[in-house]
UniProtKB/Swiss-Prot annotation:
NCBIfam families given in the database record: kynureninase
Quaternary structure annotation from Swiss-Prot or TrEMBL: Homodimer.
Top-level class of the enzyme under EC nomenclature: hydrolase
EC number: 3.7.1.3
Catalytic reactions on record: L-kynurenine + H2O = anthranilate + L-alanine + H(+); 3-hydroxy-L-kynurenine + H2O = 3-hydroxyanthranilate + L-alanine + H(+)
Family of this protein: Belongs to the kynureninase family.
GO biological process: 'de novo' NAD biosynthetic process from L-tryptophan; anthranilate metabolic process; L-kynurenine catabolic process; L-tryptophan catabolic process to kynurenine; quinolinate biosynthetic process
Protein name (record): Kynureninase 1
A molecular function GO annotation: pyridoxal phosphate binding
Keywords: Cytoplasm, Hydrolase, Pyridine nucleotide biosynthesis, Pyridoxal phosphate
GO cellular component: cytoplasm
Function: Catalyzes the cleavage of L-kynurenine (L-Kyn) and L-3-hydroxykynurenine (L-3OHKyn) into anthranilic acid (AA) and 3-hydroxyanthranilic acid (3-OHAA), respectively.
Cofactor: pyridoxal 5'-phosphate
Organism (species): Aspergillus niger (strain ATCC MYA-4892 / CBS 513.88 / FGSC A1513)
Length: 472
């Protein structure tokens, strides 16, 4: 395997849950929490209480502060992360700046500011985001929304010719990705049935895509493919693709490679720059906790973000073609309004409009927490916690009459091939009753009809003690 997965396969877990008969007890889980180096991060987040989940109003009352009201077991960070406690402070500071400075807040700094003036707030976001995805600061822009960013990137990187016009993607890609790719193909007056290559699982009951299968499809269509666009982590199964190996293989065939990292950013230890990825995009409201529909981000490798000043004014393109907007323009000339577009170097040159400072504050509130640790530490906790939860589930009592458990786990069993997610395929007809039972016990998970629930133990705020309770 490539270094991406091979490195993680060699990680030795300090946990002994597979051989310890006490692993199913609360006391054992509490001992794991006691030795967790990330345990103090939980207090940095607001976990909904069981009472909160059942409230019919949003009005704040004293009961919401009742310490006897237990927190819910929130295992849905792969769908929407919980609120960082400091989000309110960041947003309050933004509102205060807007209130007392108005338009001058774009340029005037404050001694007690959390973020720079409005005009530079996107730079602060990029600086904090870069280490989370393994990128240079210049390769990241915090901007827009995920599907819009995919369109912007494909406008630059999908440039079909008569010979190369196909896009390779998962057969069960997230619907918005599928729609975006299909519409880009139609935009170029091509037929999706000719230009979309869908990689389907070989086993319907175990819907994962083997790396060898993906590479084989790339080989079969190499001479006619313009772009490979896959998910870093597959939203349905939780499978972590071998980004480095797939990228290198496709590029060796002259194919550009992009990744939707919606379920990977803030989840696994990405190395987008080192893996030579051409481009990537992701949302920030899942593992990165920016709030519903929060501002997204994109990555453009430095080789694609260069601006050749020697070619400015010549017949040669000084920069990669793209959809352009004023916020992507050179800062030195941005406010001259001369209508001569010259982009900033790097991913910032792919920006279009000025960013929502309100949304940027919500993103940065969480990124600041991630920057207090490292993705390597977060990933190690994820490997431990997801493995522990898997162990508990695999030892769930079987039905006495059939000898079978009422579910199977369709997420890869190899820890290096998954993130902080386990997808459980339930026996037909069980979904509604299982969800009802979980809701009664204050457990929040994600459903994918007809029969799958996705469980995501988020390393920064979930505890080991929660998992025996969830299993029960």
């Amino acid at each position: 395997m490539s270094s991406q997965l091979g490195h993680e396969s060699s990680v030795s877990s300090p946990l002994s849950y597979k051989t310890d008969s006490n692993a199913f007890t609360r006391e054992y889980a509490e001992s794991l929490d006691a030795q967790d180096p990330l345990r103090d991060f939980r207090k940095e987040f607001i976990i909904p209480s069981k009472v909160d989940l059942k409230r019919k109003t949003l009005a704040i009352d004293d009961s919401s502060k009742d310490e006897s009201d237990p927190r819910c077991i929130y295992l849905c960070g792969n769908s929407l992360g919980v609120q960082p406690r400091n989000a309110r402070k960041y947003i309050d500071y933004y509102l205060r700046t807007w209130a007392i400075k108005g338009v001058t807040g774009h340029f005037l700094p404050h001694e007690d500011q959390l973020l720079p003036p409005f005009v530079d707030v996107d730079d602060a976001g990029a600086k904090l985001m870069a280490p989370i995805v393994g990128a240079l600061e210049s390769e990241v822009a915090v901007m827009g929304t995920l599907t819009a960013n995919l369109h912007f990137l494909m406008a630059s990187f999908y440039r079909p010719t008569q010979e190369r016009y196909k896009i390779i993607l998962e057969g069960k890609a997230f619907p918005s990705d599928h729609y975006a790719i299909e519409s880009q193909i139609r935009h170029h007056n091509l037929r999706p049935e000719d230009a979309m290559v869908l990689i389907e699982p070989e086993d319907r009951l175990k819907p994962i895509l083997r790396t060898e299968q993906i590479l084989r499809v790339i080989d079969e269509h190499a001479s006619s493919t313009a772009l490979v666009l896959l998910s870093g982590i597959q939203f349905y199964t939780g499978q972590y693709f071998d980004i480095e190996k797939i990228t290198a293989h496709a590029q060796s065939k002259g194919i550009l490679v992009g990744w939707d990292c919606a379920h990977a950013a803030g989840n696994v230890d990405l190395r987008l720059h080192d893996w030579n990825v051409d481009f990537a995009a992701w949302c920030n409201y899942k593992y990165l906790n920016s709030g519903p529909g929060g501002m997204a981000a994109l990555f453009v490798h430095e080789r694609h973000g260069r601006v050749d000043m020697d070619k400015v004014g010549s017949d040669e393109e000084p920069f990669r073609p793209r959809l352009s907007g004023w916020w992507g323009g050179d800062k030195k000339t941005r406010f001259l309004m001369n209508n001569n577009f010259l982009p900033q170097t790097g991913a910032a040159g792919f920006q279009l409009s000025n960013p929502s400072v309100l949304d940027m504050n919500a993103v940065v509130a969480s990124l600041e927490l991630f920057n207090r640790t490292s993705m390597a530490e977060i990933r190690q906790k994820s490997l431990n916690a997801t493995g522990y939860l898997e162990h508990l589930l695999l030892n769930y009592p079987a039905d006495f009459s059939t000898g079978k458990r009422p579910f199977s786990i369709i997420t890869p069993s190899n820890p290096a091939e998954r993130g902080a997610q386990l997808s459980l395929l339930l026996e037909p007809g069980l979904l509604d009753s299982v969800l009802e039972t979980l809701e009664e016990h204050g457990v929040v998970v994600d459903e994918r009809k007809p029969d799958v629930i996705r469980v995501a133990p988020a390393p920064l705020y979930n505890t080991y003690t929660e998992y025996p309770t969830y299993r029960t």
